[in-house]
Amino acid sequence: MSRKIHGGSVVEMQGDEMTRIIWELIKEKLILPYVELDLHSYDLGIENRDATNDQVTKDAAEAIKKYNVGVKCATITPDEKRVEEFKLKQMWKSPNGTIRNILGGTVFREAIICKNIPRLVTGWVKPIIIGRHAYGDQYRATDFVVPGPGKVEITYTPKDGSQKVTYLVHDFEEGGGVAMGMYNQDKSIEDFAHSSFQMALSKGWPLYLSTKNTILKKYDGRFKDIFQEIYDKQYKSKFEAQKIWYEHRLIDDMVAQAMKSEGGFIWACKNYDGDVQSDSVAQGYGSLGMMTSVLICPDGKTVEAEAAHGTVTRHYRMYQKGQETSTNPIASIFAWSRGLAHRAKLDNNTELSFFANALEEVCIETIEAGFMTKDLAACIKGLPNVQRSDYLNTFEFMDKLGENLKAKLAQAKL
């Protein structure tokens, strides 16, 4: 390439441990040699989050709001052991949760498929993209142990001072048990619907919403009704123009259908279903190291992309000791490619769009040509059968990707 591609504004968030090392390698070898970016960098490493009382996470989210594109490295969400390890002031919340709460939107997970990496569900030849409504329901519920006989009731007290309404949940007559009150909000469900419809249109794939509205007639029925109303009013004609469709399905039917399908659809899940099914689907495709995660805001304009996996602590401990590691960078690279592809779409930048696509193609072509990290070699041969000659280490693999990207872009005469 004789000159760099103009890329525009991107918010990048550095992370922790092994993924932080890989993140810098991706920028150095695959992004910055070819793309001139107006980078707005935020260090979301655990030490800096602690030093800034987590203000850096909020600042990063506000920057994504402003510039519409964010790419994020995996980060540590501290537990008690991490608080002790880093001598943290407190157990800071998940940065992903903080960013999601500020931006709103829905997290969509998508598998990266290579022909030579076996899938547990062999029929899945196209990705299944799961959108999880990461708000409310069990995750914001009030649950408690009922200590003995008595009534559990839920009361709604209107703000306008009108009559209270009380519902009997259960009359515990012969001893205690457990009870729970949970909720969701129309606004959040509407945002979830818009993000899901936007995602389906951007991929050109059909969309399914799964609920259990036959049992939770009012609660899940509300999800079904809001989706249908928004679809009919705002998206139906756009879907028909792309020859795709939207349907509501019962969750049990949907799970069965997903297993026997070939993939190639968007699956909008309520909070708990999305939590469970996204991991189930990820495993079905073979590897969390090959799973992207994209937060799409209801405006369809603001996007934050990251890898769906963690910081790969075990490899980082080996790296710190000077031992060889073979860490899979693909999902982190795809965070960059998806972010840049969205920047290209917003700016109508065909060169940047070509680059983002070429970067993804290089990743897949390199693996399909037999050059891969140890986790992928284990998917093919089974971990006990993997020999050192079957895989490249972290740095060798990054070099190989860099070499192949350079060749691909030279061929394209950009």
UniProtKB/Swiss-Prot annotation:
Q: What is its main location?
A: cytoplasm
Under the heading Gene3D superfamilies, the entry gives:
Isopropylmalate Dehydrogenase
Q: In which tissues is it expressed?
A: Ubiquitous.
Q: Which reaction does it catalyse?
A: D-threo-isocitrate + NADP(+) = 2-oxoglutarate + CO2 + NADPH
Q: Which residues carry this modification: N-acetylserine?
A: 2
Q: Which GO terms describe its biological process?
A: 2-oxoglutarate metabolic process; female gonad development; glutathione metabolic process; glyoxylate cycle; isocitrate metabolic process; NADP metabolic process; NADPH regeneration; regulation of phospholipid biosynthetic process
Q: Which residues bind substrate?
A: 77, 94-100, 109, 132, 212
Question: According to its UniProt entry, what is the function of this protein?
Answer: Catalyzes the NADP(+)-dependent oxidative decarboxylation of isocitrate (D-threo-isocitrate) to 2-ketoglutarate (2-oxoglutarate), which is required by other enzymes such as the phytanoyl-CoA dioxygenase. Plays a critical role in the generation of NADPH, an important cofactor in many biosynthesis pathways. May act as a corneal epithelial crystallin and may be involved in maintaining corneal epithelial transparency.
Name listed for the protein in its UniProt record: Isocitrate dehydrogenase [NADP] cytoplasmic
Q: Which residues carry this modification: N6-acetyllysine?
A: 81, 224, 233, 243, 321
What top-tier enzyme class does this entry carry? oxidoreductase
- Where in this protein does the record say N6-succinyllysine is found? 126, 400
Q: Which GO terms describe its molecular function?
A: identical protein binding; isocitrate dehydrogenase (NADP+) activity; magnesium ion binding; NAD binding; NADP binding; protein homodimerization activity
| Cofactor comment text | Binds 1 Mg(2+) or Mn(2+) ion per subunit.
Please give the SMART domains that the UniProt record associates with this protein: Iso_dh
- Which residue positions hold the site described Critical for catalysis? 139, 212
Q: Give the EC number(s) under which this enzyme is classified.
A: 1.1.1.42
The organism's taxonomic lineage, starting at the top: Eukaryota, Metazoa, Chordata, Craniata, Vertebrata
Check the record and name the Pfam families matching this protein: Iso_dh
Binding locations of Mn(2+): 252, 275, 279
Choose one Gene Ontology CC annotation of this protein and give it. Answer: mitochondrion
> What cofactor does this chain's UniProt record say it requires?
Mg(2+); Mn(2+)
Provide the protein's localization: Cytoplasm, Cytosol; Peroxisome
Q: Which residues carry this modification: Phosphoserine?
A: 389
